């Protein structure tokens, strides 16, 4: 254990003693609640709310509130919270991550802090890993809250904004991290206050917190719209790289020359093109220099094509189904619908496989899960495996981790690892072990790391005549059924890593599923034959329960569930999750991992040292070794990978912190505009700042006689219908020498304010305020989108600054700040220009159309329902809005991959674009001329 982890655990005993005291306190008053009627129990909720309003803290109310929930759960669900569950609930309320083993009833624990914190009336969010669990928990645990008079909502995909608003309005809301995150982003793309759905971020309880806050933290949530991208290059480069050969890196010091056209580093998952490869590519493409700025995007296409060829393996990293490349999750082995790699990687794989290449998208709004969860005033979470990541929870989220004791002692026997020289020998031993255990009837769960390996093992088992079920990416329709029955006598289940988190494997089987299967066999359906189903269910359930009870005792005597891992995962946590499937609630169980030197983890780390040990010992292929040195090497390899992944996540956070501060400014500004704040004063400041900026650019050097005032006035005329002339200023100052920058500024500012008042008198104040609101929102959104694109581009190349002995992060912060300032100047300049140059007409009713690109004279259209005056800007006809908005988010247990899909039309926010002929403001053009980089193509 590292020194840091020891320090992290130093205060553990103190916290556990405090939690024990709370649990004892709740138990001591339990009897007071038993004799209350349902109505009296329900009335306590209002009493607690009043006491909170009168100044009592939630901590003061905790013992009574917890005792109330315990009694309600007994009456509604027939389940009483154990004392250890009370401890877990208290840990969550205090803002800790509670580590509770599989089968300890984490879902029931969530009801305690949810009820207590909902008494404040500010809302509680319970966050799960998928829609199925969110709906299941909100329905089941929601019964307890509803019984106590609280409202319960559930956010799932494809809900309309009105439905979402209603769910967020509830006291307690269940949903997935992606849904909560996207609603936050969409709220910050809304065009009127009426479109907002969330009501703040008060308290969140995150179920499977390690999966959501650790595994998924490297992948941001992104809302995007279609971008212009040439897909032909993907196909061209896919063909081209088949003619390039893989080689090794050179080393000048050792006199080793590089070989082949490119090299691949599997450990870091990177590729590098050699000089020979560059020469071939330049020759085939007919270009002089691949690394010229005009050819920059081609380097990205080339790197992706090589990665697709060398690092992404079919049937391990992805499968091709119906002409579509589907990513296989490396943790769970499941296909997640719509999941795609970003940065053009998915398109490169599509080109390699010769299927249709789908378009890339442009980012409209983005946030990492790390920063989203840091928005909450109080955050807590629960999981079966958190201690290995305690340092990360503390450093990034300021969350302590508390291991909650189990209700019954854990009696699972964790056997030591067996290591074989070859993979074939390892799988032969695995099959022997399974056949032996299966013969006596012990249920077995086998964990593999890929679809390919699960199918190979399945073939070997079939040859031996062992009946088994396969649970992998190609089988996930039957997932819940297979998992539920994996604890039955003689069951053999082969699972790609452990999919199906949130479903317990009960020894002897699951009576609910058995009863349902029995009724379906009789031809009944819960939807079509509601009454018959309801009538037949109790009897079927009773029969199933008796059968399960008898089988449970048999399986228990056989040693419980045997978990067999066929490979160590790069994260100890995933291994522990697989092990944790066995030995729930004090049941017996056993686990063992079989390894070989061909396993990915061993191949990438320490394999040579282990190979040496085996060679020296002269061990035959089919004889395993149990060697402490080898076991230590594996543990060291795992901690290296974990540390590497932690550093990556910390790095993502450091860079996102820069964008996060900018996001807070922009979203704060948007919210002020949406909430109807009078922008008149702000627009006056915009005008003054823009005029000052124009004048500063033209008068920064030389004397008045040398200034190009004609050019300056030309710029003013583009901005607004300027009335004051250079001659008038010269006359007022006496001569040209008397015309100072301050004098020009004062005169032009007075003029622009007069012109603006005149325009307001023509249109009317109400119309002008509404026009200001729409213009500022429109410009703000478009400039922010362009800024995100620029920041993306900046981050991609910033690592190269290290070669110039500069800190990439410091450079990113500095340049990001400059770009943000240029964007803010651009927002002011464009807003003023639009307010003067848009032709506006008032209409009784107007169709909802978004703002779109114009040329010299942009057009502004109404978007979103609002009670403000209905106006329409006359100008060029607006092009069509993009058909859809796209989303991209981390997968459940995903590393590197993303779930992608399209929002339903009523979920999407309008795309608002307008701009000058080259799409740049003067501020941005000046920045580009200085070499600060204007708009650039993204690699």
Swiss-Prot record:
Binding locations of ATP: 85, 103-107, 504
Catalysed conversion reaction: ATP + H2O + cellular proteinSide 1 = ADP + phosphate + cellular proteinSide 2
Biased composition (Basic and acidic residues): 854-864
Biased composition (Basic residues): 924-939
PROSITE patterns for this protein: SECA (PS01312), SECA_MOTOR_DEAD (PS51196)
InterPro entries linked to this entry: Helicase_ATP-bd, Helicase_C-like, P-loop_NTPase, SecA, SecA_CS, SecA_DEAD, SecA_motor_DEAD, SecA_preprotein_X-link_dom
Location, primary (coarse class): membrane
Keyword list, A-Z: ATP-binding, Cell membrane, Cytoplasm, Membrane, Nucleotide-binding, Protein transport, Translocase, Translocation, Transport
Annotated region described as Disordered, given as residue ranges: 850-939
EC number: 7.4.2.8
Subunit-structure text: Monomer and homodimer. Part of the essential Sec protein translocation apparatus which comprises SecA, SecYEG and auxiliary proteins SecDF. Other proteins may also be involved.
Name this polypeptide is given: Protein translocase subunit SecA
Organism encoding this protein: Streptomyces griseus subsp. griseus (strain JCM 4626 / CBS 651.72 / NBRC 13350 / KCC S-0626 / ISP 5235)
